[in-house]
Design a protein with these regions (language model features):
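Hydrophobic single-pass membrane-targeting/anchoring helices
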Residues: 1-41
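Solvent-exposed, non-transmembrane segments of extracytoplasmic/periplasmic domains
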Residues: 39-198
């Protein structure tokens, strides 16, 4: 219940703040899943074939499409939890890591939205910001938010990545317990690199 609960807490804090685009945890939104994919190769979309048609977009190995307008390769054996059509979470079999991805319509300045959410996250137990900074993701402006918090006596580490593309906002997030950090970061990196906007 720790991972799912951690996600719920984050969702409440972010919702109260107008939350970062697609984030639901007291610092992010958790989701169960582990990646075993290879880095995605960004594509500008399907290439034209015969006049008026296009070739379907190719996905990274192991990636599957989600209703939110994206595809990603999630770990085998992780529990899938669909929050909404545009938000999906995966939880590792041991419950020590969650992955989440979501999409929504872009609303204003991404960094300002996340700063507001971060201010509200101070309500969480033992919340400690590590960083909240602008970045890029595949050439798009992005925001990275990293922090720690405690839920039901269990420490958690969160890494959230948000970016806007073509009028939509996307998030690729993870929450994990510190004792699985090495594997959790490897899994998150693989899942993040497989993320493809459709």
């Amino acid at each position: 219940m720790g991972v799912v609960t951690a996600g719920a807490v984050v969702a409440i804090v972010l919702a109260a703040a107008g939350g970062p685009p697609d984030d639901n945890r007291a610092g992010g939104s958790p989701s169960p899943s582990s990646a075993r994919s290879q880095p995605a190769t960004p594509s500008d979309g399907p290439s034209p074939t015969v006049e008026g048609t296009s070739r379907p977009q190719s996905l990274p190995p192991g990636a599957h499409r989600e209703a939110g307008g994206f595809a990603w390769a999630t770990p085998t054996g992780w529990r899938r939890d669909i929050k909404t059509g545009a938000e999906v979470h995966y939880t590792s079999p041991d419950g020590k890591q969650e992955l989440a991805a979501k999409s929504s319509l872009a609303r204003g300045d991404l960094m300002e939205t996340w700063r507001t959410s971060e201010q509200n996250a101070h309500q969480g137990k033992d919340y400690r910001k590590i960083r909240l900074e602008e970045s890029t993701f595949r050439g798009n402006p992005a925001v990275v938010w990293e922090y720690t918090f405690t839920l039901e006596g269990v420490p958690w580490h969160a890494r959230l990545l948000g970016f806007n593309e073509n009028g939509k906002s996307y998030q690729i997030n993870t929450w994990y317990q510190p004792d699985v950090e090495t594997q959790a970061l490897k899994t998150y990196g693989e899942v993040r690199d497989s993320f493809t906007v459709l």
